[in-house]
A protein has these predicted regions:
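Long, compositionally biased tandem-repeat segments
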Residues: 1-4, 8-236
Length: 236
C-alpha cells in the first residue's frame, strides 16, 4: 500500500502530447530561385512516470516554385516512454521532396522506452522530388524510413522501422525515375524482448527506365537474455 501511495502521489500524467506538424511552404520563388521549405515537425513530448511518449509531428512539403532542389522537411522524433512503464511515441513522417540521387533522411525516429515498454515505430520517409532541368531530368531519391525506438532496459520490444518514400518521377517519359528509399532499421531490444521489424523499401519512381527499388530495412537486435532479432523489411 505504501508503494502504491507513492506512485499515486507522484502522479500519472498519462500520454504525452504530440509534436505539431510543420506547415507546407508557399508557392513563391525567391530571388535565388528557391521556394520556401516546409516547417519541421515538432518532437513528441516525453511521458512522466507512467505513460506513452507523444508522437512526432509530420514535416511539411516544400513550395512549388522553380528551384535547384526540392527538400521535404523532417518529421519530429517520437517522445520517450514513462520512467516506470510506457511505450515510446512514433516518429513523424517526412515531407515529400528528396535531393536528386541522395535520399536525405527526413523521417522522424521512434521514441525509446525507458524501463518497461516497447519502442515507437519510425516515421515514413517522404517521396522523392520530380525530375527537373537542374537534376538532368532524373527523379529524386525517396527518403529512407525512420528507425524504430529501442525497447525498455528491462523489458520491451524494439519498434518497427518506418517505410521508405517512393522515388520521384522523371521529368518526362524519357527521363529516368529516382531510386526508392531504404526501409528504416528496426529498434533494438535490450535484455528481454524481440527486435523490431525493418521497414519496407520503396519502389523506384516512374520513368525511362524506372528507378531502382529500395531495399528493406534490417531488423533490430533481440534482447541479450531472451528474444529474437526482428525480420528484415520487404524490398520495394
Amino acid at each position: 500500500m505504501g508503494s502504491e501511495m507513492c506512485i499515486r502521489d507522484s502522479g500519472n500524467g498519462g500520454a504525452a502530447g504530440s509534436g505539431g506538424n510543420g506547415g507546407d511552404a508557399g508557392t513563391g520563388v525567391s530571388s535565388d530561385g528557391f521556394a520556401g521549405l516546409g516547417g519541421s515537425g515538432g518532437r513528441g513530448g516525453d511521458a512522466g512516470l507512467i505513460g506513452v511518449g507523444g508522437g512526432g509531428g509530420n514535416g511539411g512539403d516544400p513550395g512549388l516554385g522553380a528551384r535547384l532542389f526540392q527538400v521535404g522537411s523532417r518529421g519530429g522524433d517520437g517522445g520517450v516512454g514513462g520512467w516506470l512503464y510506457g511505450d515510446g511515441g512514433g516518429g513523424g513522417d517526412g515531407g515529400n521532396g528528396g535531393l536528386p540521387f541522395i535520399g536525405s533522411t527526413n523521417a522522424g525516429n521512434g521514441g525509446s522506452a525507458r524501463l518497461i515498454g516497447n519502442g515507437g515505430a519510425g516515421g515514413s520517409g517522404g517521396g522523392g522530388a520530380p525530375g527537373s532541368v537542374s537534376s538532368g531530368g532524373v527523379g529524386g531519391a525517396g527518403n529512407p524510413g525512420g528507425s524504430g525506438g529501442n525497447g525498455g532496459v528491462w523489458y520491451g520490444n524494439g519498434g518497427a522501422g518506418g517505410a521508405a518514400g517512393q522515388g520521384g518521377p522523371g521529368m518526362n517519359t524519357t527521363s529516368p525515375g529516382g531510386p526508392g528509399g531504404v526501409g528504416g532499421h528496426g529498434g533494438t531490444a535490450i535484455l528481454f524482448g524481440d527486435g523490431g521489424a525493418g521497414g519496407a523499401g520503396a519502389a523506384g519512381g516512374p520513368g525511362t527506365p524506372d528507378g531502382a527499388a529500395g531495399p528493406g530495412g534490417s531488423g533490430g537486435t533481440g534482447g541479450l537474455l531472451f528474444g529474437v532479432p526482428g525480420p528484415s523489411g520487404p524490398d520495394g
